[in-house]
Amino acid sequence: MGTAEDVFRKDLKIIHGYPMVYAFALGWEKIEEFQSRPCDIVIPTYPKSGTTWLSEIVDMVLNDGNVEKCKRDVITSKVPMLEQNVPGARRSGVELLKKTPSPRIIKTHLPIDLLPKSFWDNKCKMIYLARNGKDVAVSYYHFDLMNNIQPLPGTWEEYLEKFLAGNVAYGSWFDHVKSWWEKREGHPILFLYYEDLKKNPKKEIKKIANFLDKTLDEHTLERIVHHTSFEVMKDNPLVNYTHLPTEIMDHSKSPFMRKGVVGDWKNYFTMTQSEKFDAIYKKKLSGTTLEFCTDIQSA
């Protein structure tokens, strides 16, 4: 079985061509064989794109904005992460999901190619939240500083080079967002932008409710907006990941919920780094209609 320490700060493992967290790669066949249910709601995002935020919003929408119902458990139990697996420390995502009543909300960061086939066969509804890649890189760097099941990130300069090359867990941000964007044409996928959710949360939450066939009045929408605001969630121990053991996530190095803003990348990227990112973006995503906001004033 092993212990959690056995998987701390290990190099990534390659799964079908994608770099994966070492601990999550153990027993990968359980992920591939996972059986979805037609009523499952999947939240597939690239890491550090607002996944926990969206998870809490979806849970509140399904519970008609009932705050007390949404306090029933910690977010990692309410919305299990499919590939999560830390031997000796936590029940795996697959184990949690087997015991989760329908409708299940399932979080994952898996690239399209690694998502179990059964989700496509059952035409499960999916809500993808995309965040501008520069802010993702900064947030992911700080996350890897405090998350001991990830490899050590090195310096910011070293980490950004790995991020741009796709040599981080789950691979390239560019490829991830592009593939999920293109997949929405043939599958029930609601594609949202983190920056839009920051700018007009009520409007975006209404989109989510409509997608999930839920009718919510204005008062309920406003309650969800308040309860899922960054300020409220950052202080909520049920969702800010302080419930996890310090040996897994060390919040003294960087909090799980750090800033939640648009444009923090400007505090880290040099002009040269920004130009290099832009060049890769143009090469990989210029043929799409994806439109990311990277400026805090316009978001």
Curated annotation (Swiss-Prot):
One term of GO molecular function: aryl sulfotransferase activity
GO biological process assignments: 3'-phosphoadenosine 5'-phosphosulfate metabolic process; epithelial cell differentiation; ethanol catabolic process; flavonoid metabolic process; phenol-containing compound metabolic process; sulfation; thyroid hormone metabolic process; xenobiotic metabolic process
Chain sites annotated for binding substrate: K107, T108, H109
Residues at the catalytic site: H109 (proton acceptor)
Post-translational changes noted in the entry: The N-terminus is blocked.
Pfam families, alphabetized: Sulfotransfer_1 (PF00685)
Role, per record: Sulfotransferase that utilizes 3'-phospho-5'-adenylyl sulfate (PAPS) as sulfonate donor to catalyze the sulfate conjugation of dopamine, small phenols such as 1-naphthol and p-nitrophenol and thyroid hormones, including 3,3'-diiodothyronine, triidothyronine (T3) and reverse triiodothyronine (rT3). May play a role in gut microbiota-host metabolic interaction. O-sulfonates 4-ethylphenol (4-EP), a dietary tyrosine-derived metabolite produced by gut bacteria.
Protein name per the record: Sulfotransferase 1B1
Organism: Rattus norvegicus
Highest classification ranks of the organism: Eukaryota, Metazoa, Chordata, Craniata, Vertebrata
